[in-house]
Structure formats: C-alpha cells, structure tokens
C-alpha cells in the first residue's frame, strides 16, 4: 500500500470517529470546541437554508422593495399597501431582508437599504440574473439528474443552441437570450477593457458576440480599431441594428455565420471570445479554436474572457453556481486556467498568459498568440 493511500485511510478513520454523535457532543461542551461547534452549525445552516435567502431576494426584486425604500424610508405598515401585502407579510419580508444584510432598521423604526441592496439596484444585469435564476432553480429540483447528464427543461429551452442539435435559434429566442447576456455585459466589458490595452490593434473580431454589447463598449472606450462581429444569423441581425444606430456605424462589420460550421473571416489581428468558450464541450471548443487559429495571421492574438474554475476567492461562483448552471443547460462547462491553456496550446497558440482582473468572480482574461 502506498504512503498516500495509508495517509488517506488513517485520516478517514480519524474523521469517522469524529463524526460520531457522542464525539460531536463532547467537543461542543469544551470551551474552545463550543466556539468551533457554533461556527460549524452556522455554516451548515447557511448551506441547507440558502434557498430561503434566494427567495427572499427574489421577492424584494419583484416587489421593488429596495427602490421604494431608497426613495423613502418606511415601516412595514406604510410599505405594505404599495406591495400588495398584509402588514404581517411585509414585516416578515423586511425582517428577513434585514437579517440578510440587505436592509437596516433605523432608530426611527423605518427601514432603508444597505450598500449590498444598492448593488442590486444599481449594477446592470443583477436584477435580470436574479429573475433568470428561477429557471435554474426549477432545473435543480433534481440535482442528481443534472449530474447524470440529463439537461434541465427550463434552461435548455431558454438557450436554444444548448441542445444536442446545432440548429440556429429563431429570432424571438435569440432576442431573449441576447438581452440577458447584454444586461450583464457592461460589468464584463469593464473588466476586460481594464485588463487589456486594445489600442494597438487594427481590426478586432468578436466571435459569438451576441447583440454587440461588448464591441459597442469597446468602440466607446477605444477609438482606433475596426470592429467585426460574428454570430448566428438571428443574433447577428440584432447586432446590425445596434451598430446602425451609432454615429460611428462605419467602424463595424457583422458576419452572420455559425462559427462551428463556417470558416471565420480573416484579417483580424485580435479575436475575442467573451463568455463563449465555456458554452462549448471539449469537442466543440476544439473545433472553434481551430477555426479561430486559421483566421488569425501569425503574430495575431486571441483573448478569452470568462469565469475560470478554481479561481481563488471565486469558487462558490465558478465551481458551484456556474458549474451547475452549465450542467443544467446541457452543454459546455467551466474550465480551470490549466484546462483552457491546454485547449489553446492544442490549437497551436503560444505565449498563453493570464491577465489580472479586478473582480475575477465576474471574469478572468487569458491572452494567447498565434506563432509565426
């Protein structure tokens, strides 16, 4: 038996003895043990009751509680009629939101929002994602089925390209998911634009660019490069409409293509994949990166922006929320930096490096180069 296996067996035996009810009770009665027992109890309760916090936030968002209290601090009695709640129900909601750190009861007896609630009110896309998460909640009623590889019906229907087939989505479906992606694109674009200097590039092509929100933000921030977007026809039409309405419309070009089936336009010296690679399983990711590499001239660069698994401080998002989300969606998976690096190098890219971002929970950025 190897040393590692003996270590695992010894440690498991120790943990098995510690997990006995009498052991846990004995530890809880000790002065220091009691402190750790209480802390563990709180952590365990947070895990098993997390859905109640989610539903409290959803109720506050749907009733616009934070906006109402931002306009005027109120008591449960004064707020309840406007929410369509009884005073008792309103008080329950206010107390729950206060316990979650979203509201604060002032010395006047009225309630007002905390900075955490202001983030829900002010940050683009947060309200939309809270509402959208009801689909994920429905799909995760049976988490074992999702882990077995059976996609959930709600998210698979919302993302029409996520099924086993590769048919293009119809316009209404494309509008729905493009609007959701665009609602949070401002935060992502800000992270990417802060992480990398785009001004040295002549022609930037955003593959899978949706309705053009990222390229529009890039155009506002960097006056130089020509900007190209490639996406499915139903989505590309939305980008064309957005760009036509801009005073600098001549900077943009849109190509309606299925980037897994059709060669990409050449002549870009930078291609961006913003929240695209993680939507593909490994085989599709390899096909996509092969097309990207073929479209780039030697010395041109590829920028990948998406959340990465095992990112320090962001594991609850990348390793829990996002991993289960994509599993429920039925396609793609979040990858670690090493896994993305392996895919890039297998496609022929070199000099792969990670660029620092201010909020890795939102996105990480990897830059790679097509060698000469």
Residue map of PLM features:
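Eukaryotic partner-binding/assembly regions in large regulatory complexes
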Residues: 1-22
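C-terminal alpha-helical "lid/dimerization" subdomain adjacent to the S-adenosyl-L-methionine
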Residues: 303-347, 352
């Amino acid at each position: 038996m190897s040393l590692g296996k003996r270590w695992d067996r010894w440690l498991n035996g120790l943990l098995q003895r510690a997990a006995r009810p009498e052991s846990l009770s004995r530890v809880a009665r000790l002065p220091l043990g009691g402190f750790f027992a209480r802390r563990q109890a709180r952590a365990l309760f947070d895990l098993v009751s997390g859905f109640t916090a989610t539903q409290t936030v959803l109720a506050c968002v749907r009733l616009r509680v934070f906006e109402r209290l931002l306009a005027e601090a109120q008591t449960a009695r004064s707020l309840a009629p406007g929410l369509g709640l009884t005073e008792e129900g309103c008080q329950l909601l206010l107390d729950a939101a206060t316990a979650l750190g979203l509201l604060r009861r002032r010395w006047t007896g009225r309630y007002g929002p905390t900075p955490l609630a202001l983030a829900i009110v002010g940050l683009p896309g947060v309200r939309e994602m809270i509402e959208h998460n009801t689909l994920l909640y429905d799909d995760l009623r049976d988490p074992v089925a999702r882990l077995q590889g059976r996609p959930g019906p709600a998210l698979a229907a919302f993302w029409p390209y996520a099924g086993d087939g590769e048919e293009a989505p119809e316009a209404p479906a494309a509008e729905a998911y493009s609007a959701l992606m665009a609602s949070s694109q401002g935060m992502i674009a800000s992270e990417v634009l802060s992480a990398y200097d785009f001004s040295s590039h002549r022609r930037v092509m955003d593959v899978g660019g949706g309705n053009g929100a990222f390229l529009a933000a890039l155009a506002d921030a960097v006056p130089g490069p020509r900007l190209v977007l490639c996406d499915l026809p139903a989505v590309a039409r939305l980008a064309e409409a957005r760009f036509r309405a801009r005073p600098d419309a001549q900077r943009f070009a849109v190509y309606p293509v299925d980037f897994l089936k059709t060669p990409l336009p050449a002549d870009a010296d930078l291609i961006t994949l913003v929240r695209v690679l993680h939507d593909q399983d490994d085989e599709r990711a390899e096909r996509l990166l092969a097309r990207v590499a073929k479209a780039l001239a030697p010395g041109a660069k590829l920028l990948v922006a998406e959340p990465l698994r095992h990112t320090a401080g962001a594991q609850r998002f990348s390793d829990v929320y996002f991993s289960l989300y994509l599993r429920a969606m039925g396609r793609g998976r979040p990858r670690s930096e090493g896994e993305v690096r392996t895919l890039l190098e297998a496609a022929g890219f070199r000099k792969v490096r990670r660029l620092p971002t201010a909020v890795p929970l939102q996105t990480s950025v990897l830059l790679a180069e097509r060698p000469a």
